[in-house]
Amino acid sequence: MGEISPRGGDFDIDYILENASSLEKISLLAGHDFWHTAPLPRFNVPSVRVSDGPNGVRGTKFFDGVRAACLPCGTGLAATWDQSLLFDAGVLIGQECLAKGAHCWLGPTVCIQRSPLGGRGFESFAEDPYATGKLAAAYIRGAQSTGVISTIKHFAANDQEHERISVNAVMSERALREVHLLPFQIAIADAAPGAVMTCYNKINGQHVSESKEMLDGLLRKEWGWKGLIMSDWFGTYSTAEALNAGLDLEMPGPTRLRGPLLELAISSRKVSRSTLDERARTVLEFVKRANKAEVSTVESTRDFPEDRRLNRKLAADSIVLLKNESGLLPLNLKALKSAALIGPNMKTAAFCGGGSASLQPYYSISPYQGIMNQLPPGVEIIYETGASSYVFIPELEASEVRTPEGQPGLRMRFYREPPSVKERRVVEETILQESSWQLMGFSNPQLDRLFYADIEAELIAPATGPFEFGLAVYGSGSLFIDDQLIIDNTTVQRGGNFFFGKGTREEKATVDLVKGQLYKIRVEFASGPSSKLMKPGVVNFGGGAGRLGMVQAIDPELAIARAVEAAKRADVTILGVGLTRDHESEGFDRSHMDLPPAVASLVTAVLDVAPDAILMTQSGTPFNMLPWADNVKTHLHAWFGGNELGNGIADVLFGVVNPSGKLPLSFPRRIEDTPTYLNFGSERGQVTYGEGIYVGYRYYEKVLRDVLYPFGHGLSYTSFAYSDFAVDTASATLNVRNSGDVAGAEVVQLYIAADATTSSIARPVKELKGFAKVTLQPGETCSVSIPFDRFTTAFWDQEAHVWTCEKGQYRVMVGSSSQNILLEGVLEIKETTTWSGL
């Protein structure tokens, strides 16, 4: 391959296909490197840059990359239920792409959350396929309005991390169509994303990246898809099969399964030259379109005031007020004398989930910071952590350590040889701002796949007492303090969830430190090929990774006791608990819904002495809130809220913003209640989608199962009245009035129910088929119209293999949640019709 081209000029696709050699055409069909397509300099075809991820644009580096805007996670964006706002969010994503020099954004994610345990559930929008498709379409339209290309992913049913590259997702044709493909179908029809990324998994026995039925038959022929189909990273598993099925682009590069293997496949007539030309044409069309984007020539930043304002609105509008029984919120700042801010999530800025969604933010605002920013002088603040909730021991930040030369941070030096070789030459050096490193995509021409690195820093102990250190690696590593071996994660390794499930467990050791004393820290690291672990079904991203953590050991009982005393003293107690990217991440699924035991005990203990405490929970997907959730009076839920998380929370707490978020997921009472309790995770390479079409609220309603908080639920500081409901063949209309004292926004949700006595097939109790968000001043009334479309009454007939709209009467319901239906009407379909395609 040649050098990566700068932005090229125009090029003639037909001319290239007529005059390029087979080797040149083949080179187009795999990435040049981790983040770029291959150029053809002879024909003025440039390289195109792609970049993750669903809630921000990381750029080309997991390791030592440029900082970026971080938006709320997918479920947080969906909680706004605001298609106009998601368009604006997409515009910001597109602008970030341009600043990072990226022509193509690898997002959004639209796989359905079958289970609360799915590691990437926070990346997707909602448990409902219709809502997911509509919200994703708005996000895509916004991003593509800037000229960049969106890549909708992961096609399809990539909803668990366990053995994700090998698991066979077995489901009915109806479940596949009505639940798992429908978000893609709606978003493609409404927004025309420029690319589709295939999933890692199999569906009904075949990897989707080599399924002719899924890629050529359904996506290209039935849906008329004209855009690019790319693999997920290292998600190409064959040469001829994938090419013939319709997979245009293998990512990342350099190629593993094209190149010489594709030459052989063409020579042996397993792949025709016409197929080669078809795939090359699609890639060239993609590059031609992408090259029109006015991207920066260098990876840069754009942390502008208007971006911060938008991100703050996204954070605030995503927050869901679950309970406000005593009317405590919004808090009256003028009457506030003292406040206890308690909990492990209070000073943690959990701005994003883990994996492809993670990035280095321009900045992050913790709930504690956000609250402090708005408190007037004179309010007494009592802060207590109360309990630890981390999975991995917290990383060392640059402010806590210095390099041997005295700079903030940790010095990382790369070598060709191991530490046993004296007088090694330093090949590359960088300064880490935190004590973790992910080296997939990292390369240096002087280093082989097996290379070595020393991470060194000086630590001045902040206190006297026991400190816990932890080291997790993909590769191998050992921790030394003052040249004494403290942790050996080289000789014997135990598999864990670190680094997309490829790495080790975090090995730990406790060391007594003396306040003010200087300690020399060194990690001797070797890259991925030195690992002793082998795991089935796990993506091999290569490179290597490591994470060093340090935390002062605390007595759990004493920490809770201090929090209880703080709650007793304060006028108002705000308790912040939940999950972080340690708990929710690409690479692994949660094994349970529970909080760490100490955190659950903390909540119970604080509520016992402060029953009016405000509970602020945070996560991307539901977690176990029993037994205390039934007793709490005031409860709001934030998500992984992006850069402005803490400011958004404070805006809602103090009434700067009237909460308008609604749950895009049902919050179950127990994991045992969920539709996938018996059918989640790979068993001998297979997972059966036994719930069929009954995902989320559809399941809970069908089996009469109570939930803690229903799909679509969310309260406001004002109230709304619905009236004058009318239904015709094209739409449903109603009036909504703000009957309260403050301005606010309401999400009107429309559900359809088939008549069970006349329907020829089992249907959900009701299905979401439309929604609209309106903002009203006190006393203001507006008319809301929600149009019907071809999906309004349709189901997939898996015998005839078509969508069917069956004649009969359908109940049309509108309400403020799936369980709070306020008005009903009737839609009559006079004759049965069938259809296919988009």
Curated annotation (Swiss-Prot):
What's one Pfam family the UniProt record gives for this protein? Fn3-like
| InterPro entries in the cross-refs | Cellulose_deg_GH3, Fn3-like, Glyco_hydro_3_AS, Glyco_hydro_3_C, Glyco_hydro_3_C_sf, Glyco_hydro_3_N, Glyco_hydro_3_N_sf, Glycoside_hydrolase_SF
Catalytic activity field:
Hydrolysis of terminal, non-reducing beta-D-glucosyl residues with release of beta-D-glucose
Where it sits in the cell: the answer is: Secreted
This protein's name: Probable beta-glucosidase K
Give the EC number.
3.2.1.21
Q: Which keywords fit this entry according to its UniProt record?
A: Carbohydrate metabolism, Cellulose degradation, Glycoprotein, Glycosidase, Hydrolase, Polysaccharide degradation, Secreted
Pathway info: Glycan metabolism; cellulose degradation
Q: Which gene encodes it?
A: bglK
Domain PA14 spans what residues?
A: 405-564
| Organism of origin | Emericella nidulans (strain FGSC A4 / ATCC 38163 / CBS 112.46 / NRRL 194 / M139) (Aspergillus nidulans)
